[in-house]
């Protein structure tokens, strides 16, 4: 594996251990040239997924993009990053287990909203404001009202 600091091609694994219920291997690496230390994660990828965007174009599924969007929603909410990592892994497993080579960004968004609703209402509202493209304060009011009544659009994630 290439060193992220000096770009040297050959690094050594100093420690390997399973994490996330055995679905990921965490490796601590060290560069023999610059001495830089870094962590890599190895996980099984069942299939390549394509995301169908609202615009009609396709792009490869990007786990890191999903993670960044959830991290933005939970920022400053005191939620354990390891827990968020497990949530993201669960969402990815759900997507892969659908058996479909392509999935709409809408379905991904619904899965994320369902997960966030069970974690933190504020994170749910933050994500919903982007996912649902809120335009004014009444949009926030509506989703808060839905939350208080227990109504969400995540109930039927995969009903077509």
From Swiss-Prot:
Q: Which organism is it from?
A: Bartonella henselae (strain ATCC 49882 / DSM 28221 / CCUG 30454 / Houston 1)
Give the GO terms filed under biological process for this record.
negative regulation of DNA-templated transcription
> Would the keyword Ion transport turn up in this protein's UniProt record?
no
In its UniProt entry, what is this protein called? Transcriptional repressor NrdR
Disulfide pairs? none
Record keyword Transcription present: yes
Q: Where are the zinc fingers (unnamed)?
A: 3-34
Query: What HAMAP family does the database record attribute to this sequence?
Result: NrdR (MF_00440)
Write out the function statement from the record: Negatively regulates transcription of bacterial ribonucleotide reductase nrd genes and operons by binding to NrdR-boxes.
A molecular function annotated in GO for this UniProt entry is: DNA binding
Tell me the InterPro entries matching this sequence: ATP-cone_dom, NrdR-like_N, RNR_NrdR-like
Cofactor section: Zn(2+)
Q: Which Pfam families match?
A: ATP-cone, Zn_ribbon_NrdR
Q: Which PROSITE patterns match?
A: ATP_CONE (PS51161)
Domain ATP-cone intervals: 49-139
Protein family (similarity comment) = Belongs to the NrdR family.
UniProtKB keywords: ATP-binding, DNA-binding, Metal-binding, Nucleotide-binding, Repressor, Transcription, Transcription regulation, Zinc, Zinc-finger
The UniProt note on the cofactor reads as follows: Binds 1 zinc ion.
Domain of life assignment: Bacteria
């Amino acid at each position: 594996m290439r060193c992220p600091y000096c770009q040297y091609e050959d690094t050594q694994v100093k420690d390997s251990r399973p994490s996330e219920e055995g679905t990921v291997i965490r490796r601590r690496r060290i560069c023999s040239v610059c001495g830089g230390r870094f962590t890599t994660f190895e996980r099984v990828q069942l299939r390549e997924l394509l995301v169908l965007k609202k615009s009609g174009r396709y792009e490869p599924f990007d786990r890191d993009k999903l993670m960044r969007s959830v991290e933005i929603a939970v920022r400053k909410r005191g939620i354990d990053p390891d827990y968020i990592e497990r949530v993201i892994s669960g969402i990815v497993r759900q997507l892969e287990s659908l058996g479909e080579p392509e999935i709409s960004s809408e379905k991904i968004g619904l899965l994320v909203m369902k997960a966030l609703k069970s974690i933190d209402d504020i994170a749910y509202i933050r994500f919903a404001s982007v996912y649902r493209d809120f335009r004014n304060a009444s949009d926030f009011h509506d989703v808060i009202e839905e939350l208080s009544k227990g109504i969400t659009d995540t109930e039927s994630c995969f009903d077509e």
